Amino acid sequence: MRVLSLFDGIATGRLALEMAGVPVDLYIASEIDKDAKAVARANWPDMIHIGPVESVTAPDLPKIDLVIGGSPCQGFSRAGAGLNFNDPRSRLFFDYVRVLNEVRAKNPDVKFLLENVIMKREWEDVITEKLGVQPVHINSRAHSAQNRPRAYWSNIADLSPLSSGGGSRWTPSSTAAST
């Protein structure tokens, strides 16, 4: 699978794919934090870093099968000032959409997954409209010691939420092994 990870951080998306048994043939990452990139490179020296999301253009990329990412949440977080898309960091979501649409022009069957915080419904509705899919709300406590409610938007058809321990979890896809 050829993966483009926007807002990659320390490449936990790649780790999750590998833990799910999804073969990653190519992993291209957009990240600006130098320390996060150093951690990712130390673990996966074969990954390709392509700089900030604002400068990513799909015509410069090979065919991509999966676009993943979690755009900055500061404008949406209940812990923040509530600036929503007026926060320049949270506006980077629109770069995710731009890149995803450019990738779709090369591969109409591209799959995507976007993660963000639980936010006001009006802001969530904007993201839902731009991505064309409804979010699924999942609390990390279903899988870890953290209590972190999150919203996930995806067009991966064989993923569905299940109720579990006060949170939700994904069922493993038919092509991925559960670990």
Features from the language model and the residues they span:
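Class I S-adenosyl-L-methionine
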Residues: V56-L66, C73-T179
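N-terminal start-of-chain detector that recognizes signal peptides
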Residues: M1-R2, G21-V22, W123-T128
